[in-house]
Amino acid sequence: MSSTPSTSDTSSESSTSPATIVLCKVCALSAHGSHFGVLACRACAAFFRRTVVLERQKQYKCKKGKNECPVDTAERYQCRLCRYNKCVDLGMTPENVQFNRESASRTRKRKNENSIAQTNSFKLIPRSDNAFLGKPRTIMDISSLSTKIKSVLNGKTYNLDSAAKKMNSLEAAEYALKKWRSQQKTEDKMEKVGELPVRQLFVIFEKQMVMIAEWLIHNPDFRMLDEEEKYLYFKAVWNMWRRFERFEMSVKMFGNQVLTKRKFAISNEKLMVMDSCIDYSEITDLPNSKVAEMFRLTRSKLFHQLAKPLMELNPSSIEMAYMLTQLSWQIAGKKMQGNVIEIGERVCDNLADDLHSYYQKNEKRSNYAGRLVRLMNIVNAMKKIHLQRKNTMELARIFEMFKVDFSDPDIFDC
């Protein structure tokens, strides 16, 4: 943090007796604690944060046109520009965050709430402070998982098969994809999920994240990136990759039942259907129905915009590898810019050449332009869905819909 609140602010809060009311310096209502370096109530802290994050101060206009409206218990909602200016004049900055201290009873309550069973590499750690607006927060420590993924990406714990080293980029991508999919259970051997606790979802994610890292290093151009670039690339694409691969596998396995019964192979072992749901209660205080509604639009688009084209096209494994590789480089390029965009353009050109060779040599198909257009339509539809979901997650983060922060903040940004 670039600065800290004055000692008088801190001491006045900590020395206040239960009978003393500490007032918000912005509006003079009862203060909650020190927010952004200023003793303030929750409402003013929330107002300031929303204004800064959404850059609303650029849209605000003074109600009276004089920039001197009163901001107090009666008038704080009347002029947003004057309220924001008063916050700034008092010393509020986004970097200057000092959270109010917790009482012993709240600390005990937090410990009880966080005695959640730990799952694999996802460890819940109580925070010693409060997050914005005074909501209790928990850190999901994924440092051991990050280390595991980086080891794979940097070739320390996973070696390419000798067969894969002799293949072109597209063949190697298909080889790695088929290797993963060979573990897929048939429907009769899958566990049908009624309610899936979110911590079990994280277990599924962990296995898939490691597999996706293994898939990525089959691409020679990816292996040329430096260690930091590899990890940033992975974080940008893994959730999109997982979602698209699982959906295409579901269409391949269940056909039209993906639409009629909402069958979805969320993992190689677990099957979700129309009445299945995810229990988010460990990471949010919102009802599950509210969280589901937040993702309803992008989930609906996944089913309605991709299911039919995938069923009609019935892509081969090499075409699926082509789409996954295209998507990965395009999305990573958009996120990382610079060098990755340039490499991605070259990769996509080489992919097109590899796919051309495959069509001509393996399928004896000379006229494939129409099929290629349909493949790219699916790629573009998935890319749009991914970006929309990313925006949804950003809004969820801004308004603190979840009470868990990840130790690696942007790994779950979509």
Swiss-Prot record:
Listed Gene3D superfamilies: Erythroid Transcription Factor GATA-1, subunit A, Retinoid X Receptor
UniProt record similarity statement: Belongs to the nuclear hormone receptor family.
Predominant location category: nucleus
Domain NR LBD: 162-414
Name listed for the protein in its UniProt record: Nuclear hormone receptor family member nhr-213
Keyword match Hydrolase: no
Organism: Caenorhabditis elegans
GN (gene name): nhr-213
Keyword entries, A-Z: DNA-binding, Metal-binding, Nucleus, Receptor, Transcription, Transcription regulation, Zinc, Zinc-finger
InterPro entries assigned to the protein according to its UniProt record, in alphabetical order: C.elegans_Orphan_NR (IPR051152), HNF4-like_DBD (IPR049636), NHR-like_dom_sf (IPR035500), Nucl_hrmn_rcpt_lig-bd (IPR000536), Znf_hrmn_rcpt (IPR001628), Znf_NHR/GATA (IPR013088)
Single GO cellular component term: nucleus
A Pfam family of this chain: zf-C4
Known DNA-binding region: 21-99
Function: Orphan nuclear receptor.
GO MF terms held by the record: DNA-binding transcription factor activity; RNA polymerase II cis-regulatory region sequence-specific DNA binding; zinc ion binding
Zinc finger (NR C4-type) in chain: 24-44, 62-82
Keyword Zinc (UniProt): yes
Signal peptide: none
Xref: CDD domains: NR_DBD_HNF4A
Compartments where located: Nucleus
